[in-house]
């Protein structure tokens, strides 16, 4: 069974000896953090991850956690460390995770710096302070994904308010069709123990119920005594939640306002699944935008996103429900329809006799909107 929700593992001393198991195991992405290693160590880790993912054929994403500069003698972030961004670009990571330092200009600077290097690196903005929460709508406009850092966010707001704010952030990210990652002490007891507490199991499960795209482990894998066991535990919890169909797709409906035609077609794709028994959705997409909007409605079958290159594919591996597939050739509509069955069979999403739903979008306009869908088609796998 395909696991829809994704898992991110933070790399550190504890994972160095078991990195192959991490890359070939349950992790969909890894996070490299300068807190757990210097530049020399992190370059070595990045290169090892790249070699292992190439060897295993997995499109595992690499996220680099960017440092921040503090005001002198004050616990206040004032800017993002641009040298860290340069390091991330030089090492061809897939995402950079940036703190929100009180103004959107710093995030815009990061995007411009990445562009100046000629890189297509996704921007994850960490909601790690009240300013980040207060500016959430603007952040969702410019970020590719957000990360709820409960550790630092919990310092800036009352702890009793944190659960409600967490749920609100997840909901608003879902509505904006942006990836939302939850982190901090997901299975913290497993830093020292081989089994999680019942409360931690519930925390992970409730995150999936609420609609997060990905759960991220930090100390559990970076410095813990049981990194592989922690990863396997999160995997089992998520699979059990999804197997029991415990994620309420109906709460991801959008009501009460007009939407674009392309957005409406994505929603219609979801509704077609309720009327027709299909095993998967195959969507042809240049940038991944169409696939993200379809996945935003939490369909009960996987979304096979057919993309032209691995760089684009790795941008989708942290999005819930999406399985990337590389097809570098430009296909005609007839080829799209005929090839979809073969792609689905190849990755194990459908068998002969199953029905699949096929969609295709026009090239991205570059304006941040969903490209118009050319067709929606239901086909039998032969």
Please provide the spans of the model-predicted regions.
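Non-catalytic helical/linker scaffolds that mediate oligomerization, partner binding
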Residues: 1-382
């Amino acid at each position: 069974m395909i696991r829809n929700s994704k898992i991110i593992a933070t790399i550190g001393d504890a994972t160095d000896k078991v990195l192959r198991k991490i890359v070939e195991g349950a992790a969909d992405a890894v996070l490299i953090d300068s807190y757990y290693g210097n530049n020399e160590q992190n370059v070595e880790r990045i290169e090892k991850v790249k070699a292992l993912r190439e060897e295993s054929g997995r499109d595992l994403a690499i996220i680099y956690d960017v440092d921040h500069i503090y005001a002198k003698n004050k616990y206040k972030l004032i800017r993002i460390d641009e040298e860290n961004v340069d390091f991330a670009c030089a090492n061809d990571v897939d995402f950079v995770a940036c703190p929100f330092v009180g103004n959107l200009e710093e995030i815009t600077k990061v995007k411009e710096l990445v562009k100046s290097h000629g890189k297509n690196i996704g921007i994850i903005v960490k909601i790690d302070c009240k300013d980040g929460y207060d500016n959430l709508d603007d952040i969702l406009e410019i970020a590719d994904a957000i990360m709820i850092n409960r550790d630092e966010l919990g310092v800036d707001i009352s702890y009793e308010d944190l659960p409600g704010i967490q749920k609100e952030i997840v909901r608003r990210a879902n509505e904006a069709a942006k990836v939302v990652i939850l982190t901090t002490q997901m299975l913290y007891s497993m830093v020292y123990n081989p089994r999680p507490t019942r409360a931690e199991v519930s925390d992970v499960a409730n995150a999936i119920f609420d609609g997060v795209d990905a759960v991220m482990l930090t100390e559990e894998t970076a410095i813990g005594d049981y990194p592989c066991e922690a990863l396997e535990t999160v995997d089992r919890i998520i699979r059990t939640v999804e197997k029991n169909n415990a994620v309420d797709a109906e709460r991801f409906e959008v009501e009460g306002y007009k939407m674009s035609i392309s957005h409406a077609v994505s929603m219609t794709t979801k509704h077609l699944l309720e009327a027709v028994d299909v095993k998967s959705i195959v969507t042809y997409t240049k940038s991944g935008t169409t696939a993200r909007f379809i996945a935003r409605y939490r369909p009960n079958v996987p979304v096979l996103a057919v993309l032209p290159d691995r760089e684009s594919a790795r941008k989708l591996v942290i999005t819930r429900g999406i399985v990337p597939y590389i097809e570098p050739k430009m296909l005609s509509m007839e080829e799209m329809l005929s090839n979809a069955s073969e792609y689905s069979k190849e990755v194990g999403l459908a068998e002969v006799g199953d029905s699949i739903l096929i969609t295709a979008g026009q090239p991205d306009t570059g304006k941040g909107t969903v490209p118009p869908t050319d067709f929606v088609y239901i086909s039998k796998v032969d």
